[in-house]
Amino acid sequence: MTPIYYYRNSAHPYNRSHWGDVAVYWRPSTEFTGNVYKGEGLVAGKPEDVWECLKPEPGGLRVKWDNNVQDFQLLETVTNDITICRTVTPAAAMGIISPRDFVDVVMIKRYEDGSITSNATNVEHPSCPPQRHFVRGFNHPCGCSCVPVPGEPEKTQVLSFFQTDLSGYLPKSVVESFFPYSMTQFYNNLSKAVKSLNV
């Protein structure tokens, strides 16, 4: 069972907030002392177009539109669908959150219904120890899913799941306000990126 499948179908209750067409849910994580966050939103675009903007790859579109991703680096290709990557994130929350980096094993999975998922979790890699100028954060099982909308081929339901340990000395209030806000921006910027593909 992939992390996306588990959190998508989890019966555990979530707290919920709405920002426009985007819903963000959260509850305490079972992986670490923070929260697991779930986002849901409809994006105007075919699943393959949305995936083209979302997929985690060096030199891809993601670094151009996602304000929370500064760089993707491929550390190792395990199989065609499994890689180990380093993600660099910029400072955030008016500089309170300093630049971070994350090393994850990433698995891409396609389903018969046309859904595409990206599943990731933290891992250590000998070529990428903690580095100066970055706080090493840890992604617990997380990812994104592009799900076709029945009867509406030009729309995609995007589900996102994050349970990220930012590490360092950060006030809990900063972390808990940062993630819901950044997730709504994620959906807004993704929608703009997909739209620009078809201009």
Where are these regions (language model features)?
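Eukaryotic helix-grip
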Residues: M1-V199
